[in-house]
Curated annotation (Swiss-Prot):
<comment type="pathway">
    <text>Phospholipid metabolism; phosphatidylcholine biosynthesis; phosphocholine from phosphoethanolamine: step 1/1.</text>
</comment>
<keyword id="KW-0489">Methyltransferase</keyword>
<dbReference type="GO" id="GO:0032259">
    <property type="term" value="P:methylation"/>
</dbReference>
<dbReference type="InterPro" id="IPR041698">
    <property type="entry name" value="Methyltransf_25"/>
</dbReference>
<keyword id="KW-0444">Lipid biosynthesis</keyword>
<keyword id="KW-0594">Phospholipid biosynthesis</keyword>
<dbReference type="GO" id="GO:0009555">
    <property type="term" value="P:pollen development"/>
</dbReference>
<dbReference type="GO" id="GO:0000234">
    <property type="term" value="F:phosphoethanolamine N-methyltransferase activity"/>
</dbReference>
<dbReference type="Pfam" id="PF13847">
    <property type="entry name" value="Methyltransf_31"/>
</dbReference>
<feature type="binding site">
    <location>
        <position position="65"/>
    </location>
    <ligand>
        <name>S-adenosyl-L-homocysteine</name>
    </ligand>
</feature>
<feature type="binding site">
    <location>
        <position position="263"/>
    </location>
    <ligand>
        <name>S-adenosyl-L-homocysteine</name>
    </ligand>
</feature>
<feature type="binding site">
    <location>
        <begin position="403"/>
        <end position="405"/>
    </location>
    <ligand>
        <name>N-methylethanolamine phosphate</name>
    </ligand>
</feature>
<keyword id="KW-0443">Lipid metabolism</keyword>
<feature type="binding site">
    <location>
        <position position="385"/>
    </location>
    <ligand>
        <name>N-methylethanolamine phosphate</name>
    </ligand>
</feature>
<dbReference type="InterPro" id="IPR025714">
    <property type="entry name" value="Methyltranfer_dom"/>
</dbReference>
<feature type="binding site">
    <location>
        <position position="81"/>
    </location>
    <ligand>
        <name>S-adenosyl-L-homocysteine</name>
    </ligand>
</feature>
<dbReference type="GO" id="GO:0046337">
    <property type="term" value="P:phosphatidylethanolamine metabolic process"/>
</dbReference>
Length: 490
């Protein structure tokens, strides 16, 4: 591993070599940079919080392809880059903006300092991948200090492997897994002089759609974090990632449901239900609660559709991005809350959701959002846990409360879709199919008991067996139901 001095010298020489041309192609290390820039720049800017009148610190500012946009809205921009010729070119382009200060400096330098809580937004595009692991950690701590409470940190990195097609004699870039950045920034915390504790809350994380559309590449990933008080309640996402969908739990579920899947029946039920959608090439599909991406890859690969998969669980999206490596399919992933996420009206041909909406308390509001997001003639297909119209037994009520579920009977669920404006609503009780699938999955796990315990643990095995048997018991007693819902926007 390179020492601090060696690492900085290697990175500086690399960028001196690749910034001779001072063009967008040189900065993006890609022959199609101009076309990509036209698509990705507005996408990245749309991902940011409102910046009107704010103070923005831009690291790795380069020749200023984002500096220009930031300067037009922000109150003040401090643009920093460690290659002198590059920051001078930025100043030549953007120097007429009187609210921009240009600094030639290395972000890892001990002399790089700003007052605590002085920045509304710290922005960087392709910076951390040119720092060592320790340098990323040190800079993250400083950025947390420099950001105002309620302020934001945005960064975008190349993960897994190279994206640009420019030839390079050597490449010192650190192509990390996205979960490296997520974990490091999530664990970052500080105390101020008064003893108040602060940390970073993940607002969203997504792959850049321009690269998915143009290169079938999901490894261009951006994050948006907000500085919050450590006692802020971010309960539901934390519950999903620390309790129900811990990384170990996701791998267990995937073992049961099949590679890429964490919902009932895996690929088999996916094929059956997707066939009902009559997908056509070029259509746009939104998968709400996409999990680890198996259904999205299936739709994109077999029907040539463009899929956007969203999930509130950071762990789920991390696995989905790993599964996407090398598949070359048109699937975008984003950590997002479907009750807060905004899409333009008439965006999607299909909205698809498998065993997810049970987590949502205000289903009528969500279904109204779905209706707006769909194009006229668009379809929604949902499978979800449901319940009997009768009052739940004490045991079932405890299960529902513990999981934070909001369950309805099948017909009431269908009526909520009608009330949201949907037509041609089909609401089917598929509990018999659910039980057959559960039995098959249970048998498969029991048959490979020793292998399962070896790969996970005895406790994991008993959790899965116990959980599946409980679901079977609740379903056979008529308490737990499984519903299939299809509806159309006219």
């Amino acid at each position: 591993m390179a020492s601090y001095g060696e690492e900085r010298e290697i990175q500086k020489n690399y960028w001196k070599e690749h910034s001779v041309g001072l063009s967008v192609e040189a900065m993006m290390l890609d022959s199609k940079a101009s076309d990509l820039d036209k698509e990705e720049r507005p996408e990245i800017l749309a991902f940011l919080p409102p910046i009107e009148g704010t103070t923005v610190l831009e690291f790795g500012a380069g020749i200023g392809r984002f500096t220009t946009e930031l300067a037009q809205k922000a109150g003040q921009v401090i643009a920093v880059d460690f290659i002198e010729s590059v920051i001078k070119k930025n100043e030549n382009i953007n120097g007429h903006y009187k609210n921009v200060k240009f600094l030639c400096a290395d972000v890892t330098s001990p002399n790089m300092n700003f007052p605590n809580e002085s920045m509304d937004l710290i922005f960087s595009n392709w910076l951390l991948m040119y720092l060592s692991d320790q340098e990323v950690e040190d800079l993250a701590k400083k950025m947390l200090q420099w950001t105002k409470v309620g302020g934001y940190i945005f960064f975008r990195e190349s993960c897994f492997h190279q994206s640009g097609d420019n030839k390079r004699k050597y490449n010192p870039t650190h192509y990390r897994e996205p979960k490296f950045y997520t974990k490091l920034f999530k664990e970052c915390h500080m105390n101020d002089e008064d003893g108040n504790s602060y940390e970073l809350s993940l607002v969203s994380c997504k792959c850049i759609g321009a690269y998915v559309r143009n290169k079938k590449n999901q490894n261009q990933i951006c994050w948006l974090w907000q500085k919050v008080s450590s006692d802020n309640d971010r309960g539901f996402q934390r519950f999903l990632d620390n309790v129900q969908y811990k990384s170990s739990g996701i791998l267990r579920y995937e073992r049961v449901f099949g590679e890429g899947f964490v919902s009932t029946g895996g690929l088999e039920t996916t094929k059956e239900f997707v066939d009902m959608l009559d997908l056509k090439p070029g259509q746009k599909v939104l998968d709400v609660g996409c999990g680890i991406g198996g259904g999205d890859f299936y739709m994109a690969e077999n029907f040539d559709v463009d899929v956007v998969g969203i999930d509130l669980s950071v762990n789920m999206i991390s696995f989905a991005l790993e599964h996407a490596i090398g598949l070359k399919c048109s699937v975008e992933f984003e950590v997002a809350d479907c009750t807060k996420k905004e899409y333009p009206d008439n965006t999607f041909d299909v909205i698809y959701s498998r065993d997810t909406i049970l987590h949502i308390q205000d289903k009528p509001a969500l279904f109204r959002r779905f209706y707006k997001w769909l194009k006229p003639g668009g379809k929604v297909l949902i499978t979800d846990y449901c319940r009997s119209p009768k009052t739940p037994s004490p045991d079932f009520a405890i299960y529902i409360k513990k999981r934070g579920y909001d369950l309805h009977d099948v017909q009431a669920y269908g009526q909520m879709l009608r009330d949201a404006g949907f037509e041609e609503v089909i609401a089917e009780d598929r509990t018999d199919q659910f039980m057959k699938v559960l039995k098959r999955e249970l048998d498969a796990v029991e048959k490979e008991k020793e292998e399962f315990i070896s790969d996970f643990s005895k406790e994991d095995y008993e959790d899965i067996i116990g959980g599946w048997k409980s679901k079977l018991l609740r379903s056979s007693s008529g308490e737990q139901k499984w519903g299939l819902f299809i509806a159309k926007r006219n």
